[in-house]
């Protein structure tokens, strides 16, 4: 199965060239703190034009609109995963938008609370989609040598050992 992954288009999704594949995974930041639900409608229409058999989306920390259930219903051309999973073509996929940030959408600054969220991830998950990286796995920041990943998420990786993972990166 050919899986295409992208993220962080911040309302510029129509400017991105998306290769064909079997599955399209979008790992968050559809918007940039937009308050206009029409942005989600446009994103959903954009998703609908692609031939990928399966499409999976998680929100990111800039997707405050998706904290509202009514706005979540605007995403109909993909499986929208918010601390939830879906099985497609025999693959168990889990998606979580949770971040360790102190503000923004889906922010959970308390490590103990995040650990409880990560505990929801089934051990038999094949593909894990997150908006933040686990600690010390491709988590270097571009401007400093600091690691921005989440230690409790890294511990969950050790428990789950998914076949594949996708967390946000530059698109």
Label every PLM stretch briefly.
Residues 20, 77, 123-124, 161:
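Alpha-helix C-terminal capping/helix-to-coil transition sites in glycosyltransferase folds
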Residues 6-88:
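Core catalytic region of metal-dependent phosphoesterases/phosphodiesterases
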Residues 10, 31, 61-64, 97-99, ...:
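Catalytic metal-binding/acid-base residues of hydrolase active sites
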Residues 39, 102, 124-163:
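Active-site-proximal segments of metal-dependent phosphoesterases and phosphodiesterases across multiple
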Residues 38-43, 74-78, 109-115, 143-154:
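Charged helix-capping and loop-helix junction motifs
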Residues 1-9, 27, 90-99, 126-131:
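Active-site-proximal beta-strand elements of phosphoester/diester hydrolases
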Residues 10, 16-18, 107-125, 129-130, ...:
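Active-site-proximal loop/helix segments of hydrolase catalytic cores
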Residues 71-112:
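Helix-adjacent hinge/juxtasegments
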